[in-house]
Regions:
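Active-site beta->alpha loop and helix N-cap motifs at the rims of alpha/beta catalytic domains
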Residues: 93, 100-124, 128-174
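Conserved beta-strand positions in the central sheet of alpha/beta enzyme cores
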Residues: 65, 111-112, 163, 219, ...
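C-terminal segment of N-terminal export signals and the immediately downstream linker at the start
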Residues: 24-62, 298-299
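N-terminal secretory signal peptides and thylakoid transit peptides that target proteins
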Residues: 1-17
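Active-site mouth loops of central-metabolism enzymes
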Residues: 77-93, 136-145, 173, 252-257
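Short amphipathic alpha-helices and their capping/turn segments at secondary-structure boundaries
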Residues: 47-63, 148-156, 205-210
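N-terminal small/glycine-rich loop or linker at the start of catalytic domains
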Residues: 60-84
Length: 305
């Protein structure tokens, strides 16, 4: 039996020329594909087994971490005025719990989310009332005030680690105040948490390394589409010299790149873990991509944490 590609099926079914189809953005091509081939839509798939893990301090962390921007109402949809309302309506309490449960079923054992009341309440209910086991790495929430006090609240609600928000770190380094970052991460540790530094700019990591700050880990943006990130080649080259574990985030440019290619790229550039915001219907396939590519082996120069 001759196999017809999805692109070929589109051309035959909709009468679209290859040239026109090739000119469409990935999102539009994916949408058109669903119009003529919905064989996978809503299908229940077997959970992924054997998702790989690494170490962050004394904790075993899945190489794929489920992010929290979507459940906090942020999809980085730029000028779309309705996106926050759409996200918060979609991710009601039950949908949040369903998504976290799917993550656990597929081997993801860690989530990365803001340290704010919305997350405090949901995470505590999930772990205490629903039996959830996800570990939580917190992101400091600037609007909550002093980051060290924010860390203490995150700790009290179950976080194992916290990192300083990337925009805050970026600004401190730009202003020549890297020592302020050092003071804050020292406070994080005194609160009993692993302490990380977030960065959207490579210069932030470079400034922290030059100042000989000693975080437990870095959070660094890296992607193929230059979205809130320094050039990926430069990030990858510098991070070879950084001994601390680092978590890549915005690895798909907030949904602007394809999962398989974006994940592979981040790992090849040296990320030890990737944090990815996922809808419930993306969890299983994203996990399968990561498990398969790591099982096959990733071509990278940097040793794994």
């Amino acid at each position: 039996m001759t196999r017809i590609s999805r692109r070929g099926l589109l051309q035959k079914s909709l009468g679209i020329s290859g040239a026109l189809l090739g000119g469409l953005p990935y999102e539009h091509r994916a949408l058109l594909a669903q119009l003529v081939d919905r064989s996978d839509y809503g299908k229940v798939k077997e959970p992924v087994k054997g998702l790989q893990r690494g170490k962050l301090g004394q904790h075993e962390i899945s190489r794929l971490i489920i992010g929290g921007n979507l459940i906090s109402g942020s999809a980085h949809a730029d000028e779309l005025l309705y996106q926050s309302a759409l996200m918060t309506h979609y991710f009601n309490t039950e949908k949040i719990f369903e998504t976290w449960a799917l993550a656990e079923q597929n081997g993801i054992n860690t989530t990365l989310m803001r340290a704010d009341p919305h997350i405090f309440g949901h995470y505590q209910k999930f772990t205490r009332e629903r039996g959830g086991k996800l570990q939580w790495i917190a992101q400091s929430a600037p609007e909550q005030g002093d980051p060290v006090e924010n860390a203490k609240r995150a700790r009290d609600h179950g976080a194992i680690a916290i990192y300083l928000h990337g925009n805050v770190s970026d600004n401190f380094v730009k202003e020549g105040k890297a020592e302020e970052i050092g003071r804050i991460i020292s406070g994080f540790r005194q609160a009993g948490l692993m302490a990380g530094i977030g960065a959207h700019l490579l210069a932030t990591v470079q400034g922290c390394e030059k100042a000989k700050l000693d975080p437990d880990f870095y959070m660094v943006t890296i992607n193929r589409v230059s979205y809130y990130s320094s050039p990926a080649a430069e990030v990858g080259e510098f991070m070879k010299s950084v001994k601390k574990p680092w978590i890549g985030f915005k690895v798909l440019g907030a949904g602007r790149d394809k999962p398989l290619e974006g994940f592979q790229h981040a790992f090849e550039k040296g990320a030890d873990f990737i944090a990815v915001g996922m809808f419930d219907w993306q969890v299983r396939d994203d996990t399968a991509h990561v498990q398969a590519m790591l099982a096959k082996g990733v071509d990278r120069d940097r040793a794994w944490a």
